[in-house]
Curated annotation (Swiss-Prot):
Organism: Lacticaseibacillus paracasei (strain ATCC 334 / BCRC 17002 / CCUG 31169 / CIP 107868 / KCTC 3260 / NRRL B-441) (Lactobacillus paracasei)
Pfam families with a match to the protein in the record: Kinase-PPPase
Protein known as: Putative pyruvate, phosphate dikinase regulatory protein
PANTHER family, alphabetized: PYRUVATE, PHOSPHATE DIKINASE REGULATORY PROTEIN 1, CHLOROPLASTIC (PTHR31756:SF3)
Superkingdom per UniProt: Bacteria
Nucleotide-binding listed as a keyword: yes
SUPFAM superfamilies named in the record: P-loop containing nucleoside triphosphate hydrolases
EC numbers, comma separated: 2.7.11.32, 2.7.4.27
Residues the record lists as binding ADP: G150, V151, S152, R153, T154, S155, K156, T157
Leading EC class: transferase
UniProt record similarity statement: Belongs to the pyruvate, phosphate/water dikinase regulatory protein family. PDRP subfamily.
Summary of the function given for this chain in its UniProt record: Bifunctional serine/threonine kinase and phosphorylase involved in the regulation of the pyruvate, phosphate dikinase (PPDK) by catalyzing its phosphorylation/dephosphorylation.
Catalysed transformations (reactions): N(tele)-phospho-L-histidyl/L-threonyl-[pyruvate, phosphate dikinase] + ADP = N(tele)-phospho-L-histidyl/O-phospho-L-threonyl-[pyruvate, phosphate dikinase] + AMP + H(+); N(tele)-phospho-L-histidyl/O-phospho-L-threonyl-[pyruvate, phosphate dikinase] + phosphate + H(+) = N(tele)-phospho-L-histidyl/L-threonyl-[pyruvate, phosphate dikinase] + diphosphate
Length: 276
């Protein structure tokens, strides 16, 4: 029987950093079902006490991402008095950076959410990904920071949107054997192109499940091994001709594939867009 794990995220901003961290850590405990409760925009001592009182009542772990001066210390002391396990995430990092830079932190909650130029660049990149999804307009390949090529079910669209959230303009093109490859592809720097592939068994099983879900015969040409192998071979030959990076997305998450692409491009994985 799955046990419950209550995780309370306390923040003087939206609490996104604490939530992501809690989710990442909770994933390491598969025998527990995690329940997340956010307490955002905590700007008073009373709200700190109230959140910790509730955490005590529910036997929850409190994860705190305060940057407001004094809040983390106050919450830590109160949690200790109440017998609540509370983790102060931000203070050690702030102290570490302070030691290296000899600068005092601003202690401004939510500073990363300011509507600055980077924010609007990200919105523009998201719009670009939607506009040039699935090769809708070949001219997008010439304007893109990254061009994704791939057979079906290699996560081209979600990967495009994920990278767009890193302020990168991404266009993608689905590959079908003997289909016309737009001339624009050959004008793109191969270093900007990423070829996505997968394992034949993974692609076949996914297609079989899709046909079953549609109430159709799962053993059609769409999912037949010869057809799948033909598609993968077509893509492999094209990637060799282009001379681009190739990534097998089988058993890889969107985040893992994106990290490989960003490393290949020499880009910072987080691109300064993480939220708190």
């Amino acid at each position: 029987m799955t046990q419950e794990l209550n995780l309370y995220i306390m923040s003087d901003s939206v609490g996104e950093t604490g939530l992501r961290l809690a989710q990442a850590v909770a994933a390491q405990f598969p025998n527990f079902e995690a329940h997340y409760v956010r307490f955002p925009f905590i700007h008073t001592e009373e709200k700190i006490y109230s959140a910790l009182d509730e955490a005590k009542k529910e036997n929850a772990l409190a994860i705190m991402t305060f940057v407001t001066s004094g809040f983390a210390q106050l919450a830590t002391h109160y949690a200790k008095d109440q017998g609540v396990i509370a983790i102060d995430v931000m203070s050690p990092i702030l102290s570490g950076i302070k030691s290296i830079t000899h600068e005092e932190p601003n202690h401004v909650p939510g500073a990363v959410h300011d509507l600055n130029e980077r924010y609007f660049d990200r919105i523009s990149a998201m719009e670009f990904a939607v506009l040039y999804d699935d090769g809708k307009d070949p001219k997008g390949f010439l304007e893109a920071d990254i061009v994704l090529l791939g057979v079906s079910r290699t996560s081209k669209t979600p990967l495009s949107l994920f990278l767009a959230n890193r302020n990168l303009k991404v266009a993608n093109l689905p590959l079908v054997p003997n289909a016309h490859i737009p001339e624009e592809i050959w004008s793109v720097d191969p270093k900007k192109i990423v070829g996505l592939t997968t394992d034949a068994s993974v692609l076949m099983e996914f297609r079989r499940q899709r046909m079953i879900a549609y109430g159709l015969n799962p053993d059609t040409a769409y999912s037949a091994r010869d057809q799948v192998n033909q598609e993968l071979k077509f893509a492999e030959d094209l990637y060799k001709k282009i001379g681009c990076m190739v990534i097998n997305t089988a058993h890889r998450s969107i985040e893992e594939t994106a990290t490989l692409i960003l490393e290949h491009m020499g880009l910072d994985e987080f691109d300064n867009t993480e939220t708190h």
